[in-house]
A protein has these predicted regions:
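Conserved, well-structured ligand/cofactor-binding cores
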Residues: 1-467
């Protein structure tokens, strides 16, 4: 770096060369050089930090712990930063997730940028990163506060995606409510059901998943702000944190609260852990649904081919005309990633040694990743797979007629063992069930036709569609 391209600033360790036009200061520059690898700190975290710092500045002024002119200068600088688009905002926030596990460097990145910009906009006030922007706070309570805020924000985006998929499935459920097909257990033929009934199971699973998320989400409304370094609240002005919670609630539209045990808030992240457990459950259900759809669509000539899937793109670079269930594959890969993220979060949440957990940055990065990929793949699955999905009724009828497990309908009339022998005979001799049943002498043709009612076997009249 040539002389004209950098400036020298000092922190408590010593002088640091910093790019001349950078708004950040020495601690950010040290981190930039010390931790250059991995994904960048999510901008959701940065924006949450900015909202938190603004709320803190306003609150400190209101309780008399910050001069009004300094507080207003900090607020003004933050408003300028919040107005930037993501590309421009990123220029001043270059740090990575893999840094100190407390997120200290990212907290200081925000403090330094806000202070330097405030001094540019309001010369002469001498605003300092630690003494003014970080007043009454520490990385130990600000970073976990932003973690919960952005987690709630991410869930707010995921929930509509789940509802949208439910809506698309309900449309298909109603359309195919009385379309009878072969049921399958252990990947083997089983008794009939309707495709609508099968879809109702998917819908119910997603409704349960949505309710788990919604019921657990309020645990994330408990904010650690005010705990400062170890949970005692040292250096936080009385009344400041309650005001911060109120201001953040207005910004995000959720009832955040600070009346919680701060020692828990700094050393534990069980709220994020348990909520991510619900995301893992959603991912597991999505894997099952996507797997079912792609298997039922297998073929078209040498598979089940009960379902016709939309042709969204060419499926092969060598096999002409091939159509693949790509949206389902994206869902299953996303689910695999969520399972891995859950393991990361579970382990990282256990690392709250003494008064602070130092795996914070990787916990929230994994949580946000899960929310993002679930939101995207669920939306794509709804719009580009389920919406255009149709049933191959002719193929369903063919497989149903060839199934041996419809013999179950005869069991109440002729007994389990006699019915089993009919199925075994049909399979061994390659005949239809009806032929084997009549040959057994246990059933007349009239009885067979009466009892072998596929629709009646589904108990459709006792089933209720999911809405």
């Amino acid at each position: 770096m040539s002389e004209e391209n950098y400036r020298i600033e000092s922190d408590t360790i010593g002088p640091v060369k910093i790019p001349k036009d950078a708004l950040w200061g020495p601690q950010t520059e040290r981190s930039r050089n010390n931790f250059p690898s991995g994904e960048l700190m999510p901008l959701q975290i940065i924006r949450a930090f900015l909202h938190l710092k603004k709320a803190a500045a306003e609150s400190n002024v209101e309780v008399g712990d910050e001069p009004k002119e300094k507080g207003e200068a900090i607020e003004d600088a933050i408003d300028h930063l919040l107005a930037l688009n993501d590309t421009d905002l990123r220029k001043d926030f270059p740090l990575h997730v893999l840094q100190t596990g407390s997120g200290t460097q990212s907290n200081m990145n925000v403090n330094e940028v806000v202070a330097n910009l405030a001094n540019k906009l309001h010369p002469g006030l001498g605003i300092l990163p630690n003494d003014d922007v970080n007043r009454g706070q520490s990385s130990n309570d600000t970073y976990p506060t932003t973690m919960n805020i952005v987690a709630v924000e991410a869930l707010d985006k995921l929930e509509p995606a789940i509802k949208h998929l439910i809506d698309e499935l309900v449309v298909k459920e109603k359309k195919y409510w009385k379309t009878v097909k072969v049921g399958r257990t252990h990947l083997q033929d089983a008794t009939p059901l309707t495709f609508g009934q099968e879809l109702s199971g998917y819908i119910s699973a997603l409704k349960h998943d949505l309710s788990y998320i919604q019921e657990l989400k309020p645990t994330l409304y408990e904010l650690a702000i005010g705990g400062t370094a170890v949970g005692t609240g040292l250096n936080a002005a009385p009344g400041m944190t309650e005001k911060i919670a109120g201001k953040l609630s207005e910004v995000y539209g959720h009832e955040f609260k600070v009346k919680t045990n701060k020692f828990w808030g700094l050393a534990h992240h069980s709220g994020l852990d348990v909520v991510h457990g619900a995301l893992k459950t959603l991912a597991a259900d999505m894997f099952k649904i996507a797997q079912d759809v792609r298997m039922l669509a297998s073929g078209p000539r040498a598979g089940y081919h009960e379902l016709n899937i939309p042709a969204n793109e060419p499926g092969s670079s060598i096999m002409p005309g091939k159509v693949n269930p790509t949206q389902a594959e994206a869902v299953t890969m996303a689910a695999a990633k969520v399972f891995g993220n859950d393991t990361t979060i579970t382990f990282a949440s256990s690392q709250g040694n003494f008064e602070m957990n130092v795996f914070k940055t990787v916990i929230i990065a994994a949580f946000l990743d899960s929310c993002d990929i679930l939101t995207g793949t669920i939306t794509g699955f709804a719009d580009k797979m389920i919406h255009g999905l149709t049933v191959n009724e002719e193929r369903m009828d063919e497989l149903l007629e060839n199934s041996l497990m419809t013999v179950t309908a005869l069991s109440p009339h002729i007994g389990y063992h006699a019915a089993a022998k009919i199925a075994q005979t049909a399979d061994k001799e390659g005949t239809t069930l009806k032929e084997a049943a009549l040959k057994s002498g246990k059933v007349t043709e009239e009885q067979y036709d009466k009892w072998m009612d596929y629709m009646k076997m589904t108990n459709i009249d006792q089933s209720t569609p999911e809405e």
